[in-house]
């Protein structure tokens, strides 16, 4: 009898890499430019919570994006992202979308070098939010009983409209560009999920504001799992 052992794991890190920075009393390049605190983003150093995962697990699914367009957390003045490469700050300071490109470039390369033989790598596209009338801290809501119509989807997510949830498609643009030429598989869950404004906890989430980001269970995420299993079966068939 043959026994097949497969290992998969879950790791949480907001930006895929090492973070955290505060001004040094002795001064430095960033200090001389007036920076006092922020989030150090080492674009070429993976966070320790997952750095060893590629050499151990058989299947890895990555995603990133929401936090890169989160001014409530990464305020460009009070707590900006400060990008480092080879241990040195990148001057002039990079905007988040340029930093994201660098992080994706380095992290994809890192995983491809470290992934165990036969390992399968996925990058999941963005899980869309559905805030209407403002962001989560601005009275945004998502009180729907039915999936959205195509024109409603475009109103919320179209890059031309620059709506509250525009980061969903923006991040996907950067992700698809970064994955060109790699051997990652893409788990495309964005388009199907954009219609499901009715599938969030909304006012039933137990929070002071509508929860239009997380998903009810069971529901949309079960379809993601079905899609994932289909991908695995196709990979098995091709091999």
Task: Give each language-model segment a name.
Residues 1-239:
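A compositional signature for long Ser/Thr(±Pro)-rich, low-complexity
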